[in-house]
Amino acid sequence: MNLKQLAGEYAATFVKDGMKIGLGTGSTVYWTIEKLGERVKEGLSFQAVPTSKETEVLAQQLNIPLISLNDIQSLDLTIDGADEIDSNLHLIKGGGGALLREKIVASSSKELLIIADESKLVTHLGTFPLPVEIIPFSWKQTESKIQSLGCQTTLRLKNNETFITDNNNMIIDCVFPHNITNPANLHNHLKMITGVVETGLFVNMTSKAIIGTKNGIQEL
């Protein structure tokens, strides 16, 4: 069993009967969703909000009952992955392009459970490029303003074409030369730029992290 599968399947044990949960996106959460599909067959009853079309399709294939955030007040738990996790449980997310919906769902949850393998643990955020979701209109001007914060930027592509999010936006991936020492401050500065929709910095949102290591599960 690989480390992503180890963490992902373990996280499924946190889902209890009657819960309303958020389901994240990515290669680690895939294993959680697969395991939850097995538990549904065994009689577990819960409802889920998907954070992407990709997750929605997988959940439907496994007969996991889906609901809309518009129909409920809050979620009991969201299970999601991360691209980087620092010692304060601040995150970089959005490598898969679903950061806006992931943040909306996470902020609607009483708890955010992050799952990852040990390679995602870092001292400081920023080795992994920070995704920033922007609107397409006048995107070059928005990118220029982002660059003024001291980073190198790349417009995200997929199959040699501009990557478009589930919300019909674009993503700028940002590399800061000296890592990100104050994620909250950077997030606030980015959000003040007109044209920026959301950032991949998840600050003070994580309740617990489940890390798959060579020695087993580590809870942070």
Curated annotation (Swiss-Prot):
<comment type="function">
    <text>Catalyzes the reversible conversion of ribose-5-phosphate to ribulose 5-phosphate.</text>
</comment>
<dbReference type="InterPro" id="IPR004788">
    <property type="entry name" value="Ribose5P_isomerase_type_A"/>
</dbReference>
<dbReference type="GO" id="GO:0004751">
    <property type="term" value="F:ribose-5-phosphate isomerase activity"/>
</dbReference>
<feature type="binding site">
    <location>
        <position position="120"/>
    </location>
    <ligand>
        <name>substrate</name>
    </ligand>
</feature>
<comment type="pathway">
    <text>Carbohydrate degradation; pentose phosphate pathway; D-ribose 5-phosphate from D-ribulose 5-phosphate (non-oxidative stage): step 1/1.</text>
</comment>
<dbReference type="InterPro" id="IPR037171">
    <property type="entry name" value="NagB/RpiA_transferase-like"/>
</dbReference>
<feature type="active site" description="Proton acceptor">
    <location>
        <position position="102"/>
    </location>
</feature>
<protein>
    <recommendedName>
        <fullName>Ribose-5-phosphate isomerase A</fullName>
        <ecNumber>5.3.1.6</ecNumber>
    </recommendedName>
</protein>
<feature type="binding site">
    <location>
        <begin position="93"/>
        <end position="96"/>
    </location>
    <ligand>
        <name>substrate</name>
    </ligand>
</feature>
<dbReference type="Pfam" id="PF06026">
    <property type="entry name" value="Rib_5-P_isom_A"/>
</dbReference>
<dbReference type="GO" id="GO:0005829">
    <property type="term" value="C:cytosol"/>
</dbReference>
<feature type="binding site">
    <location>
        <begin position="80"/>
        <end position="83"/>
    </location>
    <ligand>
        <name>substrate</name>
    </ligand>
</feature>
<keyword id="KW-0413">Isomerase</keyword>
<comment type="similarity">
    <text>Belongs to the ribose 5-phosphate isomerase family.</text>
</comment>
<dbReference type="InterPro" id="IPR020672">
    <property type="entry name" value="Ribose5P_isomerase_typA_subgr"/>
</dbReference>
<feature type="binding site">
    <location>
        <begin position="25"/>
        <end position="28"/>
    </location>
    <ligand>
        <name>substrate</name>
    </ligand>
</feature>
<dbReference type="GO" id="GO:0009052">
    <property type="term" value="P:pentose-phosphate shunt, non-oxidative branch"/>
</dbReference>
<dbReference type="GO" id="GO:0006014">
    <property type="term" value="P:D-ribose metabolic process"/>
</dbReference>
<comment type="subunit">
    <text>Homodimer.</text>
</comment>
